[in-house]
């Protein structure tokens, strides 16, 4: 309500409804229905609006400098060994996705569809690491969710909208940032329907989840419960537009090679270890020939596959690749442990033969790159417990015997004495 007070001449004096200044103290007072605003407050409002517009413009240009596909792959190469085909496919898809986001901000007439990605590869082949690294390169919020925890609405388990909540939380509750983030849905092969024909019974953690994910992956305004959990009618929701969220889905799809083999007729031959090698190579060749019909036969519904235009396959890791993974990436297991011991002024040395044994053990356990850390954690546990309490150790040497036969590592003491 505008402020009015009686003046000396009996006339009412008018005041600005916002700052309280009298009409005589300002250049101009603009009247509205029951309110007044002075020229100074109008100027201040203009400044605030201009500042908001500037910030909005800055947000729309966040991805104006998206790295080129070659630059994205070059950074991926620093963290992930091998998998060149998958890295190229991901680099192009991510580049195009965020260029598409810019295009929408600039209100282009051309509608470019989303480039959601399906990664197919064995456990420990680098699917999650690739997705995490992409989010770091583009500098966007990132969330990982397990598809096996999801169920369709009305059943025990997580609603699919909760995957958006994790992204919001990782974006420091900034919904605008979350709306251009990346979500990695792991173990998506576990939500395949139980057979490739429609079932008359409910498949609440399979086809039902695929159906529930369709709209979110394609792009919709999702109602997200702010505290997570199940939705109920009298609850307030966070509204999140998913049209610019990049979805990367990953899974091992263990039986998929057999489906492709039955379609293509490719056979594997060989004997002993040679047979294993040939089968592994043939499996990689088979996986590269995957087509949508194979995925439908596996148990993904056609509408779901249609929302995943980019399909990239990852190779099964061999001993040579695991050796490289152990040594070479920026955040390799070897470099991490070397740095941890450096902080204690201790040198860490792994013999080449020890690294060979670690790689062979990871292959035997079928745990891929993820298994490397588990093996080394087990070997290094006692050392990592003891070393911070000791100041006499100069170097720790890990030999093949340490890995193969669980003998104690060699410790070189600062007084040149050796304890084996």
UniProtKB/Swiss-Prot annotation:
Q: Which residues bind Zn(2+)?
A: 16, 19, 38, 41
Residue numbers binding ATP: 122-129
* UniProt key word Zinc: yes
Q: A single Pfam family, by name?
A: ClpB_D2-small
Q: Which CDD domains match?
A: RecA-like_ClpX
Any one GO MF annotation of this record: ATP binding
Q: Name one GO cellular component term.
A: HslUV protease complex
What keywords does the record list, in alphabetical order?
ATP-binding, Chaperone, Metal-binding, Nucleotide-binding, Zinc
Location of the ClpX-type ZB domain? 4-57
Recorded superkingdom: Bacteria
Identify the InterPro entries for this entry: AAA+_ATPase (IPR003593), ATP-dep_Clp_protease_ClpX (IPR050052), ATPase_AAA_core (IPR003959), Clp_ATPase_C (IPR019489), Clp_protease_ATP-bd_su_ClpX (IPR004487), ClpX_bact (IPR046425), P-loop_NTPase (IPR027417), Znf_CppX_C4 (IPR010603)
What are the GO BP annotations of this UniProt entry?
cell division; proteolysis involved in protein catabolic process
Gene3D superfamilies, A to Z: 1.10.8.60, ClpX chaperone, C4-type zinc finger domain, P-loop containing nucleotide triphosphate hydrolases
Cysteines joined through disulfide linkages: none
The text of the family note is: Belongs to the ClpX chaperone family.
Query: NCBIfam families annotated for this entry?
Result: clpX, PRK05342.1
Its job: ATP-dependent specificity component of the Clp protease. It directs the protease to specific substrates. Can perform chaperone functions in the absence of ClpP.
Summarize subunit and interaction data from the UniProt record for this chain: Component of the ClpX-ClpP complex. Forms a hexameric ring that, in the presence of ATP, binds to fourteen ClpP subunits assembled into a disk-like structure with a central cavity, resembling the structure of eukaryotic proteasomes.
Recorded hits in PANTHER family, A to Z, give: ATP-DEPENDENT CLP PROTEASE ATP-BINDING SUBUNIT CLPX-LIKE, MITOCHONDRIAL, ATP-DEPENDENT CLP PROTEASE ATP-BINDING SUBUNIT CLPX-LIKE, MITOCHONDRIAL-RELATED
Protein name as annotated? ATP-dependent Clp protease ATP-binding subunit ClpX
Q: From which source organism is this entry?
A: Leptospira interrogans serogroup Icterohaemorrhagiae serovar Lai (strain 56601)
Q: What is the lineage of its organism?
A: Bacteria, Pseudomonadati, Spirochaetota, Spirochaetia, Leptospirales
The coding gene here is clpX
């Amino acid at each position: 309500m505008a402020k009015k007070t009686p003046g000396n001449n009996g006339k009412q004096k008018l005041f600005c409804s916002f700052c309280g200044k009298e009409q005589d103290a300002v250049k101009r007072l603009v009247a509205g229905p029951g309110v007044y605003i002075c020229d100074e407050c109008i100027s201040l409002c203009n400044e605030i609006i201009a500042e908001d517009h500037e910030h909005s413009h800055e947000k729309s240009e966040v991805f104006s400098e998206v790295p080129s596909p070659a630059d994205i792959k070059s950074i991926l190469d620093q963290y992930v060994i091998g998998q060149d085909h998958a890295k190229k496919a991901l680099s192009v898809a991510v580049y195009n996705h965020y260029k598409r986001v810019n295009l929408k901000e600039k209100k282009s007439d051309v509608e470019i569809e989303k480039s959601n990605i399906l990664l197919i590869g064995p456990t420990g082949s680098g699917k999650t690491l690739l997705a995490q690294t992409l989010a770091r390169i583009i500098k966007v919020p990132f969330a990982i969710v397990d598809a096996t925890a999801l169920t369709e609405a009305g059943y025990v388990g997580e609603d699919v909208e909760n995957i958006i909540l994790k992204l919001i939380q990782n974006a420091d509750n900034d919904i605008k940032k979350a709306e251009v983030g990346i979500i990695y849905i792991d173990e998506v092969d576990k939500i395949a329907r139980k057979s490739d024909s429609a079932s008359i019974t409910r498949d609440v953690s399979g086809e039902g989840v695929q159906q529930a994910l369709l709209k979110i992956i394609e792009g919709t305004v999702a109602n997200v419960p702010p505290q997570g959990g199940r939705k109920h009618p009298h609850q307030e929701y966070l509204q999140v537009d998913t049209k610019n969220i990049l979805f990367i889905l990953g899974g091992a799809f263990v039986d998929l090679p057999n489906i492709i083999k039955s379609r293509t007729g490719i056979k594997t031959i060989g004997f002993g270890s040679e047979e294993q090698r040939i089968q592994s190579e043939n499996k990689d060749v088979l996986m590269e020939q995957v087509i949508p019909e194979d995925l439908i036969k596996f148990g993904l519904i056609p509408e779901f596959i249609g929302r995943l235009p980019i399909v990239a396959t990852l190779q099964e890791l061999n001993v040579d690749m695991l050796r490289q993974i152990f040594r070479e990436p920026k955040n390799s297991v070897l470099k991490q442990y070397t740095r941890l011991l450096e902080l204690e002024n201790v040198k860490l040395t792994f013999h080449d033969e020890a690294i060979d044994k670690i790689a062979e053990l990871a292959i035997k356990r079928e745990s891929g790159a993820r298994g490397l850390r588990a093996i080394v954690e087990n070997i290094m546990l006692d050392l990592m417990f003891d070393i911070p309490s000791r100041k006499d150790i100069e170097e720790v040497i890990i030999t093949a015997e340490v890995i193969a036969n669980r003998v104690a590592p060699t410790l070189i003491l600062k007084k040149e004495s050796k304890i084996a």
